[in-house]
């Protein structure tokens, strides 16, 4: 389920997240969320292409499927190869796939602005998903904004600094992410906040949604833990916790976008 990029989804006057998963959440919102409609055959053309431009990242996130490291991996695509990849995406019929540049930390890539400018010049819609590290500066944000990025995503994996910082591996990351959200709003850059639900942070789900609303996020995306990379060492939700989460997501479905929740439709029916 993917909510349309609409600024009111998380800032609707009078809206508030319902209670803790497992309690007695509020009633059905009364209408279905808007969705971005896919009108082409996904067997012939991807809808979104997510390119991990580097494995380099200063953080050591517990769930990282890429097992990011402090330096680029051997075999990372060169700038010329990156241009070739972008050219391949424009070989499809319009509308072209959306391109998301991530990592690792995409800000670790020295030619990030060039890749964005080239993709935009070819008619691609480009978003980025950087890590919030000392590389996340106003100058870099302005540079990617001027290159053509109009949307970015960041991660907020806890309702509190204690939980988020433990998840990301560095103290102060929560506060820096909050500051980054304020910076993006000042610069007029739309952003979404992502979170991965695990047994360690699910108790803070309502607070994470509230934080996303208060910080002015355009969307709040939730993911279930995929036990791969460093994430293989984390505890997944129990069956009962997963069921509670699905009901909670359903009751907040006008404000939350979900990824890989294959049983959510069944819970919509049961609701």
Model-inferred region functions:
Residues 215-218, 231-261:
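C-terminal scaffold of the Radical SAM
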Residues 79-101, 109-226:
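Radical SAM/AdoMet-radical enzyme domain recognition
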Residues 17-19, 262:
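Long, compositionally biased low-complexity repeat segments characteristic
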Residues 82, 242-245, 269:
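Hydrophobic/aromatic residues in well-formed alpha-helices
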Residues 263-271:
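Single conserved hydrophobic/aromatic residue that forms the stacking wall/gate
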Residues 76-79, 170-174, 236-243:
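Short, conserved loop/turn and helix-capping segments at secondary-structure boundaries
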Residues 2-13, 17, 25-147, 240:
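Conserved alpha-helical substructure of the radical SAM core
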């Amino acid at each position: 389920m993917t909510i349309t990029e609409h600024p009111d989804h998380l800032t609707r006057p009078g809206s508030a997240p319902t209670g803790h998963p497992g309690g007695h959440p509020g009633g059905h919102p009364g209408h279905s969320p808007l969705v971005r409609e896919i009108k082409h055959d996904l067997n012939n053309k991807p809808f979104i292409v997510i390119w991990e431009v580097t494995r380099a990242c200063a953080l050591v996130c517990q769930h990282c499927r890429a097992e990011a490291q402090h330096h680029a991996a051997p075999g990372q695509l060169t700038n010329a190869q990156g241009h070739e990849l972008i050219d391949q995406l424009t070989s499809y019929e319009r509308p072209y796939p959306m391109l998301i540049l991530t990592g690792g930390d995409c800000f670790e890539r020295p030619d990030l602005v060039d890749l964005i400018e080239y993709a935009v010049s070819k008619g691609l819609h480009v978003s980025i998903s950087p890590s919030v590290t000392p590389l996340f500066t106003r100058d870099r944000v302005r540079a990617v904004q001027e290159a053509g990025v109009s949307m970015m995503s960041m991660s907020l994996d806890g309702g509190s600094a204690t939980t988020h910082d433990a998840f990301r591996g560095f103290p102060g990351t929560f506060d820096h992410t909050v500051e980054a959200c304020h910076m993006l709003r000042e610069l007029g850059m739309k952003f979404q906040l992502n979170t991965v639900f695990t047994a360690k942070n699910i108790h803070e789900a309502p607070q994470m949604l509230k934080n996303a609303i208060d910080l002015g996020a355009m969307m709040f995306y939730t993911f279930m833990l995929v036990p791969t990379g460093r994430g293989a060492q984390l505890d997944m939700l129990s069956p009962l916790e997963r069921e509670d989460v699905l009901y909670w997501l359903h009751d907040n479905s006008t404000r939350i976008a979900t990824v890989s929740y294959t049983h959510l439709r069944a819970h919509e029916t049961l609701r």
